[in-house]
Swiss-Prot record:
It comes from the Eukaryota. Mg(2+) 1 binds at residues 132, 197. A motif (DDXXXXD motif) lies at residues 132-138. It comes from Postia placenta (strain ATCC 44394 / Madison 698-R) (Brown rot fungus). The lineage of its organism: Eukaryota, Fungi, Dikarya, Basidiomycota, Agaricomycotina. The gene is STS-29. This is Terpene synthase 29.
Amino acid sequence: MSAVTQVVETAIGCVIPSCIEFGSSMRIATSLGSPSVTQSPCVNRDVEDIARTARESIRFFLAELSIECVPYTQDPALEAQVASATRCWPDRERLAPHIRTGIVIAATAYAHNSLATRTLIALYTAIGVALDEPDILESANAIGFHHSLCTETSERPSAILDEWRRILARMWDHFPRFGASCILTSTLQFLNMTMLENETKGKVLNRTAMPFVEYRRMTDGFPEVYTAFIWEKGRFPDVQVYMQAIPNAMRFINFGNDILSFYKEEAAGETGTYIHDRARLTGLSSVETLREVVEETVSAWRQVCEILGEGIARDAWNSFVRGYVTFHVHNPRYRLSELL
């Protein structure tokens, strides 16, 4: 997610972000520059071979989900609300690409939520994505953020973190107590892991460190946050309706991004990814690992569907999945138009 988000106009006038990322996993989005052991043999494969592998896996993935993506359409009401809310943000020009990212993810994956909730999601995402960039994170002085929440101090957080804190405080107005608390704790985990990643770049993974790779993947990409966003309090006040689906929904969010990012990462020769780290530590090729991840992600999706059963909670999940995939498929950053 360290890439600068750009916005392009399509021939029919739809605005589509070309470099969206929301979180490591959104690396929604994603690997936060995971440490590498060595270059994967997949990097040197012919681009056509990479494309063939990715095409087969992604087509299988989408077919299993029965996803039919629709073109991204703008949400004027959402854009107006976000523009008003961010008008006085500090350093707004620098944050503008990330604000666009927030709008698009809210308009696609969370289209089933109310306008007020979509607006809050867009604002939260804008700052979260911005803080995934090392220079912005450093300038925000995030290192003292966690401690400041537990102490009485006159030292206030940076302007951008203070804005994020105010946004976080509003989560209880839009999500059940459990969901809002998950958003807070997951946010703190993201910041903590992101700072650790920046402090330990180049650290070689121990061959027995697979549990750490899994742990890092679950903490550096907001999966719990973006799962909690699916079910807003106004329509889903009782968390018991969906709570057992949360772990598998988190896996779907993380691994879904890994699958849909695979082609552009392989074509660019990127090796600091979850799939590459997992392949190295398990002794498999990245192609074999991709296929495993696809199977695990489809399984997670099925289990969420089974747990939710029929009804509005399942409808919200289906809407999220369709929008989440659309976010990737119609985003030029992921280069999926070259495959599908």
